[in-house]
Amino acid sequence: MSKPSDHIKRPMNAFMVWSRGQRRKMAQENPKMHNSEISKRLGAEWKLLSEAEKRPYIDEAKRLRAQHMKEHPDYKYRPRRKPKNLLKKDRYVFPLPYLGDTDPLKAAGLPVGASDGLLSAPEKARAFLPPASAPYSLLDPAQFSSSAIQKMGEVPHTLATGALPYASTLGYQNGAFGSLSCPSQHTHTHPSPTNPGYVVPCNCTAWSASTLQPPVAYILFPGMTKTGIDPYSSAHATAM
């Protein structure tokens, strides 16, 4: 590639004047040495020179600069290489991919001002929501009317004891939760056998005192009787 004819070289400075002869000499002495290594060694040697040793090369650089200004009075230095800061800036700038619009209303194909109208009209905005699993919406209290509450009360009057496997262990006779059927069938209430703090409505007969007595395990050793180790039975008989 040919160089442009209008390119004007810069005038040499003192280091370039000195290194011009030294580079040729060092390249002849070390033919396998790379040019960058030669430049490093020449720079280190230039710094070790005294001002008296540098003076002839400084004067020669001033003469060359004055001659260059006479030959090219309109010369302006224009670097062909980009500055290092611009190279670093261009190196780490990566274009970000377009991930699409994050607004779901715009992605649905709605006009620009449609989102404001949907916020002011809940009925319109509800059409874009997924269907709820519950039959009644928490946002519409009109659905909880008296007829809806009556429909919720229409449950079977008596559940079979086999449907609830723990009904027999709790002492229910006519159904596990038959009291949940209708208010007219609630004959009485009694404390729960498992938790006396709760009252259970039921249409069965009341529990007797013997059914509320917790079971007691006895361990009899030779020479011992049950009456001697049963303080609970004696205390219960005294209270009765």
Swiss-Prot record:
Q: Tell me the protein's name.
A: Transcription factor SOX-14
Tell me if S-adenosyl-L-methionine is a UniProt keyword of this record. no
Principal localisation: nucleus
- Record keywords: DNA-binding, Nucleus, Repressor, Transcription, Transcription regulation
User: Would you indicate the residue range of the signal peptide?
Assistant: none
Instruction: Quote the Pfam families the UniProt record gives.
Output: HMG_box (PF00505), SOXp (PF12336)
Cross-referenced InterPro entries, in alphabetical order? HMG_box_dom, HMG_box_dom_sf, SOX_fam, SRY-related_HMG-box_TF-like
Q: What organism is listed for this UniProt entry? A: Homo sapiens (Human)
Q: Note the DNA-binding span(s) on this chain.
A: 8-76
This protein's GO CC annotations? chromatin; nucleus; transcription regulator complex
Q: Which GO terms describe its molecular function?
A: chromatin binding; DNA-binding transcription activator activity, RNA polymerase II-specific; DNA-binding transcription factor activity, RNA polymerase II-specific; RNA polymerase II cis-regulatory region sequence-specific DNA binding; sequence-specific DNA binding; sequence-specific double-stranded DNA binding
- GO BP of this protein: brain development; entrainment of circadian clock; negative regulation of DNA-templated transcription; negative regulation of transcription by RNA polymerase II; nervous system development; neuron differentiation; positive regulation of transcription by RNA polymerase II; regulation of neuron migration
Its job: Acts as a negative regulator of transcription.
Q: Where in the cell is it found?
A: Nucleus
SUPFAM superfamilies noted in UniProt = HMG-box
Keyword Cell membrane assigned to the entry: answer is no
